[in-house]
Regions:
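Short helix-loop capping/hinge segments that flank enzyme active sites or metal/cofactor-binding pockets
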Residues: 1-4, 53-110, 124-127, 131-133
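A short alpha->beta transition loop at the rim of the catalytic pocket in nucleotide-sugar-dependent
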Residues: 165
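Conserved short alpha-helical elements in the N-terminal third of ANL/AMP-binding
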Residues: 160-162
Length: 169
C-alpha cells in the first residue's frame, strides 16, 4: 500500500520507499505482489474513537476503584481526563451503532483479505517525530477527537489493523 486506505498520500517518501523495497525483495523471492487497497471509508474513525473512548473510561474506573485514587485532573494526564469527561456522555445507542459500524469494517476487510496473504504498508506515514511533538500537553485546548484524527496522518494503517485484528508489523 503506497497510500493510506482512504487515498491520502504518506507525508514522507522514505516510508513509501521502504514499502517498495520490501515489495522488491518479496518479488525477487518469487512472490506475486499487487497494489490494492481495502474498501474503507475514512469515517470509520469516528466509530473507532467512540468505542475506544468508552473502553478507556471503563479501564480508568476499574483502576480508580482498585487503587482508591479519585478520577480527576490531578490523577490523570490532561488529555486522558478530557477524554474521560467527553466519553461519559456517550449514549448506549451511539455505542451500539459505533460497534455495528466497526463490525462492517471488519467484515469488509476480511472479505478483501480473502484475495491476499499479507498487506505491506508503512507503519508510520512520517519519519520519527522530535521528542515532545506527540505530546498532548503542548496543545491543551485541542479537542480529543481532533487530536486522535491528527494522529491518523502519522499512522494511517495502524487503526485499521487494531479494529480488525489484522496482523501488523
Amino acid at each position: 500500500m503506497l497510500r493510506t486506505p482512504y487515498g491520502d498520500v504518506y507525508e514522507n517518501h522514505e516510508c513509501v520507499e521502504a514499502v517498495k523495497s520490501a515489495v522488491g525483495l518479496l518479488e525477487s523471492l518469487g512472490h506475486i505482489c499487487v497494489e490494492d487497497y481495502p474498501p474503507l471509508d475514512v469515517h470509520y474513525h469516528e466509530a473507532r474513537i467512540l468505542v475506544q473512548s468508552v473502553g478507556t473510561n471503563a479501564w480508568i474506573e476499574r483502576v480508580a476503584k482498585g487503587s482508591g485514587l479519585p478520577i480527576s485532573e490531578d490523577t490523570l494526564e490532561p488529555l486522558v481526563y478530557k477524554a474521560y469527561l467527553e466519553a461519559r456522555n456517550v449514549t448506549a445507542s451511539a455505542y451500539v451503532a459505533a460497534k455495528s459500524e466497526l463490525t462492517k469494517v471488519m467484515r469488509d476487510l476480511g472479505q478483501f483479505m480473502e484475495h491476499y496473504d499479507i498487506l505491506i504498508s508503512p507503519t508510520m506515514g512520517i519519519m520519527p517525530l522530535e521528542a515532545g511533538f506527540y505530546n498532548p500537553f503542548s496543545r491543551p485546548e485541542m479537542p480529543v477527537h481532533d487530536w486522535v484524527l491528527e494522529r491518523r496522518r502519522w499512522s494511517g494503517n495502524t487503526a485499521m489493523c487494531n479494529v480488525t485484528g489484522q496482523p501488523s508489523i
